[in-house]
Amino acid sequence: MATTATCTRFTDDYQLFEELGKGAFSVVRRCVKKTSTQEYAAKIINTKKLSARDHQKLEREARICRLLKHPNIVRLHDSISEEGFHYLVFDLVTGGELFEDIVAREYYSEADASHCIHQILESVNHIHQHDIVHRDLKPENLLLASKCKGAAVKLADFGLAIEVQGEQQAWFGFAGTPGYLSPEVLRKDPYGKPVDIWACGVILYILLVGYPPFWDEDQHKLYQQIKAGAYDFPSPEWDTVTPEAKNLINQMLTINPAKRITADQALKHPWVCQRSTVASMMHRQETVECLRKFNARRKLKGAILTTMLVSRNFSVGRQSSAPASPAASAAGLAGQAAKSLLNKKSDGGVKKRKSSSSVHLMEPQTTVVHNATDGIKGSTESCNTTTEDEDLKVRKQEIIKITEQLIEAINNGDFEAYTKICDPGLTSFEPEALGNLVEGMDFHKFYFENLLSKNSKPIHTTILNPHVHVIGEDAACIAYIRLTQYIDGQGRPRTSQSEETRVWHRRDGKWLNVHYHCSGAPAAPLQ
């Protein structure tokens, strides 16, 4: 029987060195080509962990990167598949992020911002000429070729990039990073190349004053701002910016994508192509200071999101004696730090749009511990990125949240709240019913009236690894392990475990639990 020879071209041709970065399924390491001693950055993807769809995305990224050869784009030099791993060999860019470099400069002017956006537009124009849309233009993906003064800006990370048909618009899914998403993507309209120009407009705005045009702690409010194109040029920081710079921003942040300036047109704008005579040369110290805070906030937000993937905590009415886990404490402390940083008046223009929502350090009454399977990947590589499955992820989070609310109602002995979340004809299989199918609320009402409502002892519930299956627009199923900690009648701590499945149906915009299946120990702790 013939055997297929395993490819070892990467292992044979390249020597690996230190790690440069890490993601959910990939790691980036410095490597050297043995024959030339040339240094590169190798993105190593563990293909054993990839789904069929992930494989398609990987192939698409490699195909797109092979097409693009431009001095302002991180170039792909090689793409090699070996047993269990795929290697993408890129330029080794050593200058770090553009935004981090700016804050280290002694002098930074509007003309410098013009030079930066010029290079970014050159890269965007190149990819658009090849019918590629990046979809994730943001500061994290704008790198410098080296640490030398005047090093080229390079556009990186084509993981969300797509191939389009010329100027044709279509719905390619919800992808990007919240503050840089265009109105048409948020409206779920067909879209194309103009989404990259919108993101360039956001980046240019930040380059000039150090804070973003759209901001709110509440993502829904942020999206409303973007869809309305609700940005302005507040005094005093914008008073020293030339009208030509504001004009270019206005043309980039045009709500109607058909009327938005193109990359080619933007490169011909006087503020870009005649910067020496049009752009101001005045040093912008306040911009540098605001940008420093903006950078700190970006990094902190990434750390918080990564921490919160480990453990999310939700508050219920009763006080619990159960201590917060280390991950929960870290998430809470990070949340407090974020709140402090975000609400400071001096924080890079956020003063203009303070959110009424806030981050609280919560008592751990109902804890949800996710694994990395439900569209929530523990990736520091994309923790600030909305994935292509964002729509699905949001709906899954909605189901997890309503399940938490239902369990909180049970823990609180609140039958009224319970009935508002459950269908009157709720069917259930559960240990308390001795394997019989129960229909309606009366069976559960007995426990609420005679056990749960009389229970004054602390209860702490942990939902482990919730798996959500979305079934069409208005139905979903969630399966999880539920651990319930409680104090028994003798004052001793106890834990019960049950494996639960709930089927949810949305009617008139409201989710109702229509079926419940529980195995293991009774969910209601016996006193």
Curated annotation (Swiss-Prot):
Residues 283-292 are annotated as: Autoinhibitory domain. It is found in: Sarcoplasmic reticulum membrane. One of its GO terms (cellular component) is cytoplasm. Keywords: ATP-binding, Calmodulin-binding, Developmental protein, Differentiation, Kinase, Membrane, Neurogenesis, Nucleotide-binding, Phosphoprotein, Sarcoplasmic reticulum, Serine/threonine-protein kinase, Transferase. Induction: By cocaine in cardiomyocytes. Autophosphorylation of Thr-287 following activation by Ca(2+)/calmodulin. Phosphorylation of Thr-287 locks the kinase into an activated state. ATP binds at residues 20-28, 43. Residues 294-316 are annotated as: Calmodulin-binding. Its EC number is 2.7.11.17. Residues 14-272 form the Protein kinase domain. Activated by Ca(2+)/calmodulin. Binding of calmodulin results in conformational change that relieves intrasteric autoinhibition and allows autophosphorylation of Thr-287 which turns the kinase in a constitutively active form and confers to the kinase a Ca(2+)-independent activity. The modification Phosphothreonine is found at residues 287, 306-307. Its main location: membrane. It is a peripheral membrane protein. CAMK2 is composed of 4 different chains: alpha (CAMK2A), beta (CAMK2B), gamma (CAMK2G), and delta (CAMK2D). The different isoforms assemble into homo- or heteromultimeric holoenzymes composed of 12 subunits with two hexameric rings stacked one on top of the other. Belongs to the protein kinase superfamily. CAMK Ser/Thr protein kinase family. CaMK subfamily. This is Calcium/calmodulin-dependent protein kinase type II subunit gamma. It comes from Rattus norvegicus (Rat). The lineage of its organism: Eukaryota, Metazoa, Chordata, Craniata, Vertebrata.
